[in-house]
């Protein structure tokens, strides 16, 4: 499986689309807006307001309304600082990045409806451009970005971890699609190694693109436990693996497809992220904290409704990569099974989700 081709959120604006089922990531983005606001203020304290334009990038933007929130927040803070500093009129250039499979049409349609693109106000003119490509490599010219933002994207891996088959070619993570309590230590080690390599590549590419003293605001799903197989980080993938296994038992999916599939994603701990940033040495950590949120952004006591809501949210960001492996024709059955597992086996009990937000500044010299 080529991750660059298979990884994207559900397209369009329909019932299963990411645009209609991203309330959780919207809440995460909303919770971290004060951090982004402070980052923009800090940029102005470093004399970046002397430039005619501020160049910002939102990496892994998908099609969520989050993008509008990010752009409007940066723009609003620029206007505020312009008034406070009595500086010249500024322009804001925002680059929206995701893999080529992303639904950029729906994204820009949404931005245009909110009068972001081409909207000229008194202090700040805003211009937006799409940049398809992998953020694990270079996307922009050297020293061209003042600010980088990424929300719930940097945990995706460039590929499934290597070394998950034995010398005889047998799958080492049989019956699972991610780290689980049953996974041998080599699986956990392979996932951490792949995340280390990919996040290091991410930092290295950004260190070349971000101007001296420029900054990044990164938000990642994470875990509090040192154990990567803890339920807080494995919940979604564990339930999907159970649902897929049930379809295997019914003869609807080939067992080999389950045994050879490993999700290209990793929920790191705060300590793991900190260690990688410090080892890389391109950025200093200005701010770093973890926080918890209810996975479902709704008050609902009915376990079946909770199951259906969670299944829709999960389907919105997992269906493309899952269907690439197992086929489009069984997707309805798979997510119906997922709903049933949440409602019946778990009685609608859904663990909270943990996130990390960090602000990094590029080291000079």
UniProtKB/Swiss-Prot annotation:
Family statement drawn from the similarity comment of this UniProt entry: Belongs to the methyltransferase superfamily. Type-7 methyltransferase family.
Matching Pfam families: Methyltransf_7 (PF03492)
First-level EC class: transferase
Pathway this chain belongs to: Alkaloid biosynthesis
Coiled coil: none
Record's keyword terms, sorted: Magnesium, Metal-binding, Methyltransferase, Transferase
Domain of life: Eukaryota
Enzyme nomenclature, EC number: 2.1.1.-
UniProt cofactor note: Binds 1 Mg(2+) ion per subunit.
InterPro entries registered for this protein in UniProt: MeTrfase_7 (IPR005299), MeTrfase_capping (IPR042086), SAM-dependent_MTases_sf (IPR029063)
Gene Ontology process terms (BP): methylation
Residues involved in S-adenosyl-L-homocysteine binding: 18, 61, 66, 98-99, 134-135
Protein name, per record: Probable caffeine synthase 4
Gene behind the chain: TCS4
Function in brief: May be involved in the biosynthesis of caffeine.
Cofactor requirement: Mg(2+)
Source organism of the structure: Camellia sinensis (Tea plant)
Swiss-Prot/TrEMBL site (Involved in substrate discrimination) positions: 149, 221, 265, 313, 328
